[in-house]
Amino acid sequence: MNNRVHQGHLARKRFGQNFLNDQFVIDSIVSAINPQKGQAMVEIGPGLAALTEPVGERLDQLTVIELDRDLAARLQTHPFLGPKLTIYQQDAMTFNFGELAEKMGQPLRVFGNLPYNISTPLMFHLFSYTDAIADMHFMLQKEVVNRLVAGPNSKAYGRLSVMAQYYCNVIPVLEVPPSAFTPPPKVDSAVVRLVPHATMPHPVKDVRVLSRITTEAFNQRRKTIRNSLGNLFSVEVLTGMGIDPAMRAENISVAQYCQMANYLAENATLQES
């Protein structure tokens, strides 16, 4: 028996398809999302509707974004969901969530079992629309969730941690074993809730500067910031901000990265790389 076939659909490796089929896990996720009628609910990658059906049961209208044309067509003809669905058959990586929020007249509640092969770049795409998003609930590779929630001084802490926590309050919800999927992935999974900050705890003047600093620091994470960020900050400037130049990228807090970004935005012209 081909374990890549589920409900008559052959899971496509290039789309990173693993279909959720554990009812306890499904119920737990839907309970965490707690969808309500009248809310602008948006699902990324509905697949075979494991989450779409129980969420859709509670709603009058649901928007879904599905890249796989066969799955999009299948949803279109779904016996009870079909009439409730607005289906965008396209790549979520190119989707304009800001336009959709404007069209729906309220911030979006986004959820989904994200394809693990694009989960990190998709998170960065979504972060650029946090003004248009109320909250997000995602099934991700457990290692990615660990990175999202990690604090300084840990191996999991990296650029994704800093940028996610700059934009959102990040809350782990549930761990999910490979056996909850068909075909079972080779990794453990977890569900995470991301709630964009209503008021930024660490405002920055130019998020592009924060992005550049974190990229340069974590690309050379074993180096001290005296070396990895030496082209941007002198030892005197770092010391003046109360930041030890002998620290590595993983030792610096989100607040300190934001402090550095604001200094650079005020005192230097960001050179586009």
Curated annotation (Swiss-Prot):
It catalyses: adenosine(1518)/adenosine(1519) in 16S rRNA + 4 S-adenosyl-L-methionine = N(6)-dimethyladenosine(1518)/N(6)-dimethyladenosine(1519) in 16S rRNA + 4 S-adenosyl-L-homocysteine + 4 H(+). Gene3D superfamilies: Ribosomal RNA adenine dimethylase-like, domain 2, Vaccinia Virus protein VP39. Keywords: Cytoplasm, Methyltransferase, RNA-binding, rRNA processing, S-adenosyl-L-methionine, Transferase. One of its GO terms (cellular component) is cytosol. It is an enzyme of class 2 (transferase). It is found in: Cytoplasm. Pfam families: RrnaAD. The keyword Membrane does not apply. Its EC number is 2.1.1.182. Specifically dimethylates two adjacent adenosines (A1518 and A1519) in the loop of a conserved hairpin near the 3'-end of 16S rRNA in the 30S particle. May play a critical role in biogenesis of 30S subunits. HAMAP family: 16SrRNA_methyltr_A. This is Ribosomal RNA small subunit methyltransferase A. It comes from Escherichia coli (strain SE11).
